[in-house]
Regions:
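A generic signature of intrinsically disordered, low-complexity regions enriched in glycine/proline
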Residues: 12, 81, 91, 119, ...
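Compositionally biased, low-structure terminal segments
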Residues: 28, 34, 71, 177, ...
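Catalytic cores of eukaryotic secretory-pathway lumenal/extracellular enzymes that build
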Residues: 1-177
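Eukaryotic Ser/Thr kinase distal regulatory-tail detector
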Residues: 164-191, 196
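Lectin-like carbohydrate-binding module/patch detector with strong preference for beta-trefoil
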Residues: 186-326
């Protein structure tokens, strides 16, 4: 894989990535591709900065592969439509079926990112969901259930995947558990979380909502919709409230100025501190000793002194007893 460089769609200026800033591909449990810093163990494995970098996944579209090998792997899944999921499918099967996916830091390809999709999307089917469910059914084994939780197990009609499963068996590919342990060991596993799902206030039908996926936004209260997405949260075994790589972060300090303290989302850092929480008798308590409270207008979410008699500080959150079953 090359480094994908951005070409400005107005000026055609090329923005080049410094070799020290190269990232590798990953994915979240919505089965969406994302970028990650190169892990320390991978940096240590390489002898010089121009050496290839192993990557768990790729963005797709820009890569080189031997044609015969590509066909042996089954090419792209013919049951997938238009766009979405195909890059993760080829990433997983390359690694799980004996290959290796690497980024070559000295290879650069410029790309103009479209502002809108040029495709005509069918109105009667969620194409991306169909594609990613096919991907999950064939390659994720029991880990597919973490994705299905977020879909409320509404898989839709994803077609027949028997031929793709037969291909995997014929190629004698590794399990997805092997992939996570050997290729992407830094990936957060939802089954290790203590709580999961929506965080619903006991006084009002309001849930804690990320207000979009942009880092640095304040958590808000929003009518519970039961669709996951912005309202799907997990508490890790380390006490982080997170969705994939985004964690609740509370720095404090505003209350001393007579202002209300908000909670923001930032990249998870696994260091505790601002990102460490616990659930105590329905209250969500921060390391600082303050608790999460829904404001009287049902929209604001603030940190306040803990009061077990204040129902706006009481939340319902599903406790995970076991990993989801197939």
């Amino acid at each position: 894989m090359p480094l994908i460089e951005i070409i400005d769609d107005n000026t055609f200026q090329l923005y080049s990535t410094p070799i020290e800033s190269v990232q590798v591909g990953g994915f979240d449990w919505n089965l969406i591709f994302d970028w990650h810093p190169v892990p320390r163990y991978e940096m240590a494995r390489r002898k010089q900065k121009t050496d290839p970098i192993r990557s768990p996944t790729m963005a797709g579209g820009l890569f080189a592969i031997n044609k015969k090998y590509f066909e042996t792997l089954g090419s792209y899944d013919p049951g997938m439509e238009i766009w979405g999921g195909e890059n993760l499918e080829i990433s997983f099967k390359v690694w799980m079926c004996g290959g290796e996916l690497v980024c070559t830091p000295c290879s650069h390809v410029g790309h103009i990112f479209r502002k809108r999709s040029p495709y005509k999307w069918p109105s009667n089917v969620n194409v991306v969901r169909k594609n990613t469910v096919r991907l999950a059914e064939v390659w994720l084994d029991d880990y597919k259930n973490y994705y299905y939780e977020r879909l409320q197990n509404d898989l839709g009609n994803y077609g027949d995947v028997s031929e793709r499963k037969a291909l995997r068996e014929k190629l004698q590919c590794h399990s997805f558990d092997w992939y996570l342990k050997n290729v992407f060991p830094e990936q957060f596993i939802p089954g290790e979380s203590q709580y999961y799902g929506e965080i619903r206030n006991q006084a009002e039908p309001q849930c804690l909502d990320s207000n979009g996926d942009t880092l640095g936004k304040a958590i808000i209260g929003y009518v519970c919709h039961g669709q996951g997405g912005n309202q799907y949260w997990m508490m890790s075994k380390n006490g982080e409230i997170r969705r994939d790589e985004h964690c609740y972060d509370y720095a404090g300090g505003k209350s001393a100025l007579g202002q209300k303290d908000k909670i923001f989302t930032y990249n998870c850092h696994s260091q505790g501190g601002n990102q460490k929480w616990q659930v105590v008798d329905g209250q969500i308590k921060h390391e600082s000793g303050f608790c999460i409270e829904l404001s009287a207008d049902k929209v604001g979410v603030f940190m306040q002194e803990c009061d077990k008699n204040n129902v706006r500080q009481l939340w319902k959150w599903k406790k995970r007893e076991d990993k989801p079953k197939a």
